């Protein structure tokens, strides 16, 4: 609480995370307390002061205090030395128009060493969730990709947080009784493809014949879905993905969640679960694919990856599969350092082979 009469809370806000307050009795409209093009990652309140951590697109997270007079002070400079040695490339914001007219917020990071007149391959990143967001923070994945010579694209398609309830609920299934939408692989797919084409049009240094796509969890789902519905990308990496929604409801540690999205249980509408599953479109997948998965993943069990790999091998498609023993769904964020480095090495070698050579 702010002073016993207010409640403070963070909210995703168009790529940012801001801090708001509202009356503890529920009256009044929420009031912005801490804003800006940045993401607040934690906070506490004492004596009318708010101590919080925040970072933005070119600065790592540090500690700040908002004093009682409304002034703000930075208390730590932990990230300055790293940023001085490895300056993050600032993103450029743009928007793309989806086929139904929806405006999708997106960003592009130019490759390190960018030179006017040159052409570069590009990687489209799709976030997990799906109810989360990309935005104004330093993300090591993007900086590593840019450092390897890629233009880096990312966006917040429908299903993401940070925009509106309607935006987040747009990918609920068409059979849902409340707020029916397109289902997974509907308008979200349209949005990420619109962003891809807009980036190629807007940034002439992107070589549209050398595009890659990658993502983890829901982002892995979307990667698998994309290559089952278009050959636009020259290479893809599907990581810790959901490839079979029906199987996910049987053996995941979040079994039951898809009732909220699909609009019915897997027992009542198995055909709808399969319609929205990449497994249904294996025969349409022709893009060279790298599959990355942790063997101890309980969120998206490794059988999700095995199903994809075995099917594509049976179809004699170009597919590679790397398994990480002893790792969970959190490999990229909390895995063993040796495995996190190995993952980057495998990922970059794969895309270099297909997009840089």
Could you describe each region identified by the protein language model?
Residues 1-119, 130-148, 175, 197-201, ...:
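Peripheral, non-catalytic segments that deliver or gate enzyme domains
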Residues 154-357:
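Active-site-proximal cap/loop segments of hydrolase catalytic domains
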Residues 125-128, 144, 154:
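Structural cue for short, hydrophobic secondary-structure segments
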Residues 105, 127, 329:
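Histidine-centered divalent metal-coordination motifs
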Residues 53, 126, 239:
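Conserved residues at the C-terminal ends of beta-strands
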